[in-house]
Amino acid sequence: MTPAQQRAFDAHWARYGLDYAGTPRDLAQAFGRSAPVVLEIGFGNGEQLHAAARDDPARDYLGIEVHGPGVGRLLNAAAADGLSNLRVMRHDAVEVLREEIAAGALAQVRVWFPDPWHKTRHHKRRLVQPAFVALVASRLAPGGVLHLATDWQDYATHMLAVLDACPALRNTAGAGRYAPCPPWRSETRFERRGRRLGHGVWDLVHVRD
């Protein structure tokens, strides 16, 4: 972490950061109001999450990321814009979902470009597994959306099979199909680089009925 990123923690964590407690969290209290909550897991450098919170003030945004420099960058960006609808956690996302997020509490969950763990022997480390998807589905409100995106075709195939097999979720594109990129996901720097290298991108948008 750079000195500037450490200063961001020191200056802005009290305003935007939520420390993991391992007990049910009142999201309305955390944000100071009652509004739909969008969760982004693994927000990287925070570029997308910052833009989403800035451009969509009617909803609240919670980001979870374990990478310190990315958290520091997002804290600086949020403070520079004076955002009030953004909160950040630096902890394992599965533990946060399991221990702190109530059933039906989320309007949307976004997992964009998670680590594909491309070697076969590492596939078990992939975040998107049946137990994870079932947990996320239980935290979505009726009509809530789970949106995944990846630029790794093998992982996309795996994701599609796992999501389509979850009885609590419906594929908005139809069973066995990928979704068009929805308007709320703008292109990331990582994605632009991938496209220049000829990589495809696959979006999956499933809704809890």
Q: Which residues fall in each region the model found?
A:
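SAM cofactor-binding core of SAM-dependent methyltransferases
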Residues: 36-95
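Conserved beta-strand signature within the Rossmann-like core of class I S-adenosyl-L-methionine
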Residues: 142-150
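A short glycine-rich, Lys/Arg-flanked "PGG" loop and its adjoining helix->strand segment in the class I
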Residues: 128-142
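S-adenosyl-L-methionine
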Residues: 1-39, 47-56
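Class I S-adenosyl-L-methionine
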Residues: 159-209
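Class I S-adenosylmethionine-dependent transferase superfamily signal
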Residues: 109, 136-137, 146, 159
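A short acidic, Gly/Pro-enriched loop at the edge of an enzyme's catalytic core
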Residues: 99-108
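Conserved class I S-adenosyl-L-methionine
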Residues: 122, 149-165
